[in-house]
Amino acid sequence: MTPMNKIAFLLAIAYALVAGPAYAQQQFKVLVAAIPNKYHNDYAVVAKPAFEQMARRHNFEMTWAWNTMPFDADLAGYDAIVFLNTPGEELKGEQRQRLENYVRAGGGVVAVHRALIATPDQWPWFERLIGRPFRTHPYIQTGVIEVVDRNFPATFALPYRWLWTDEWYEYGEPYSPDLKVVLTVDESTYDPTLIWPGQKAEGMGKHHPVAWYHRFDGGRIFVTALGHTPELYNDSVYLEHIYGGIYWAATGRGIQRK
């Protein structure tokens, strides 16, 4: 090998050592809290490999948590935290304070399905983070979802009208006028009054939101009511819906200006 070739060879190795890790650098870091609970205990076994594949496909680092232990440490290293069928009430004491500090420092939160059922008497801050107080839901039924905001990443992969089977949550009035709804459900496509004996559900009328986003207390919050049954986590369109919310919550990017 000539001296010039040797120099070129050494430079190539040096470049590979420097450039290789940079090329493999993942774009952001996400904590997924998926804690089984009374009515949602089977979903996580299906969701975990689906989220792992999502992380590989979209090149982000994911930490999966079956319990609240990650909230015992500083959360600043995460760009977004996903409460996957996991209500805020799972967090206790200082864990709650760490989440509040994280959001106030500009962190992103994604709340999925069961996470929307907050208990205002236990943690009013988390219910305001969700944006609306939960009321009830009827039996699982098929309904038609309508995209009302095409400009948000969580709707980019969705058809304008989307046939979907889930629990259709009902809520009270929003805590803030700043909630930006991206999906609604057409109540004429299912029976909003079909509920267990002794309970009452009456729907929300023409404007029944199922997904929205807002900025709250310094952080970026994406909320979707979709995601009750385990089978839904095998649906590629649904997973793109979730990823769109994660992407925005983690980066603040992707909203198309009208």
What is the predicted function of each stretch?
Residues 20-24:
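Sec/Tat signal peptide C-region and signal peptidase I cleavage site
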Residues 89-160:
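A glycine-rich, often tryptophan-bearing local segment used as a flexible ligand/cofactor-contacting loop or short
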Residues 1-8:
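Positively charged n-region of N-terminal signal peptides that target proteins for export
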Residues 8-19:
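Bacterial N-terminal signal peptides
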Residues 25-29, 34, 53-57, 190-191, ...:
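Extracellular ligand-binding/catalytic regions of CAZymes and related secreted enzymes
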Residues 27-37, 42-119:
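Helical hinge/lid and interdomain linker segments adjacent to catalytic or ligand-binding clefts
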Residues 106-110, 182, 222:
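Structural detector of well-ordered beta-strand residues that form the stable sheet scaffold
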Residues 138-217:
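Catalytic beta-strand/loop cores that center a nucleophilic Ser/Cys/Thr
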